[in-house]
Amino acid sequence: ILALAVISLVGLGLFVMRELQAERPAVNLRLLRNVTFASGTVLGGVLGLGLFAGLFLMPMFLQKLLGYTAVDSGLAIMPRSVAMALTMPVAGRIYNRVGPKRLVGFGFFITALSFWQLSRLSVAIGYWDIFFPQTLQGVGFGMVFVALSTASLSTISKPDMTAATGLYNFFRQITGSVGIAMAASQLTRGGNHYRALLVEGISDYRDKTHAWTQTLSGVLNQQGIEPSMVHQKTLGLLDKVVTQQATMLSFNHVHFLIACIFFAVIPFVFLLRTRVISLETQSGKAAKGEELPWKT
């Protein structure tokens, strides 16, 4: 893994050097000298990370820990998509009125808040414990999508628009893939880590452990389990509970990490500087060759 990481970093460095020196680069990295576009690209990358990582985590959480079927988990995460679809047209309508900074900043804040809420779940939750964070997340994504892409590309000249659009979408797709990989890796590592911590706290000499195993053994005896198998089944059920709780904690950990990332990039919103103008005025000024006004 280390060797592949070194090869990847060297290859990335050579690629960046080549693209910066080429007269007609395949990926025009010079566009990142534009502060508004660069900050918008960073925010768009984090947006892609949260979007894809969240879409990866929630179905796994519902099916693996809560026993949802694929259909039920799809219905459970539907509020996010519905909220996003309803919010995007509204965000487009109020974009010129409130400006991109407020829309994007508030959208990132409530999205981070939704991931923080998801980091506080347990295996004893119900549907509504999922519904409200998912809906809030959809509203946040819906507010950011339209406003961020418009603001990021508004300072790009027309000849560079195609390259800038491709670069913006490229970063968002790449970080989306990174988000899924990061989430999967952290789930595995977190599960092992939290399981080790939980196992350290289990001992026959602890009153809670002893009481739990005695209660469970009594239940198994009442169910007609052979006495010789009771102890083995008790340990098996205890192991299952520990694994379940460790997995739950690892999901919470990943959601918390994503929330921290969203909170951390909010200052980039203040670097957005964009032209905000009605379509009618924009068409008239463009026809006359006049400069479009700036709104920061």
Question: Across the structure, where does each feature detected by a protein language model lie?
Answer:
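Hydrophobic alpha-helical segments of secondary membrane carriers
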Residues: L43, L167-F171
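Hydrophobic transmembrane architecture of multi-pass small-molecule transporters
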Residues: F171-T274, L279-T296
